[in-house]
């Protein structure tokens, strides 16, 4: 087990360094096999995209509860819409019980689902449920989709380098089945701390 989270720098690949691909692949493989995740740096994504999303998310979470509940998640097995405090407890995944996670969530899936039976037929739920968008802030949708697009491209890049290591058993990804959450954790005093994307 790693004693610290690895930081993997993609800048040499982006700059075209021919020797960097295998080095990055090895670092990604090591992170996947030891800790299970890593911090990726040097990815070239404009930090303004994340800053604009964070600002829009904080404004959304600051709205009164009644306004957020207009787009409340319709069913517990569906990661779409607003999920208020008290509905999720991470420890339940391991069969335990505890007080609910002290967070609120806004969740979406892909916004460009093809109009084909695989995506629209009876077996498509909940993976392809429609997104629920708030009326305000007006830019939340565009900010989330811009961020999604950049993260999806980055994920394809990372996934491609991990495939260079045959010892890793890489599962085929279906990008249409991904979900994307904005979460805000609060202190016990109920003031908003920060948004996690």
Predicted regions and their residues:
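Peripheral, non-catalytic segments flanking oxidoreductase cores
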Residues: 1-197
């Amino acid at each position: 087990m790693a004693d610290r989270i690895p930081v993997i720098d993609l800048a040499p690949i982006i700059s075209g360094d021919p020797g960097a691909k295998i080095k990055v692949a090895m670092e990604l493989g090591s992170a996947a096999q030891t800790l299970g995740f890593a911090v990726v740096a040097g990815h070239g994504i404009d930090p303004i995209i994340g800053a604009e999303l964070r600002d829009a998310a904080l404004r959304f979470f600051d709205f009164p509860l009644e306004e957020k509940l207009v787009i409340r998640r319709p069913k517990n097995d569906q990661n779409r819409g607003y999920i208020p405090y008290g509905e999720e407890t991470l420890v339940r995944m391991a069969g335990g019980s505890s007080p609910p996670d002290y967070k609120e969530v806004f969740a979406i899936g892909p916004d460009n689902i093809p109009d084909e039976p695989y995506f629209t037929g009876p077996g498509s739920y909940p993976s392809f449920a429609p997104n629920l968008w708030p009326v305000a802030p007006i830019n939340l949708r565009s900010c989330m989709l811009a961020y999604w697009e950049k993260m999806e491209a980055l994920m394809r890049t990372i996934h491609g380098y991990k495939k260079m290591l045959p010892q890793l058993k890489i599962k085929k990804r279906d990008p249409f089945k991904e979900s994307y959450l904005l979460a805000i954790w609060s202190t016990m005093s109920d003031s908003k701390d920060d948004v996690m994307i």
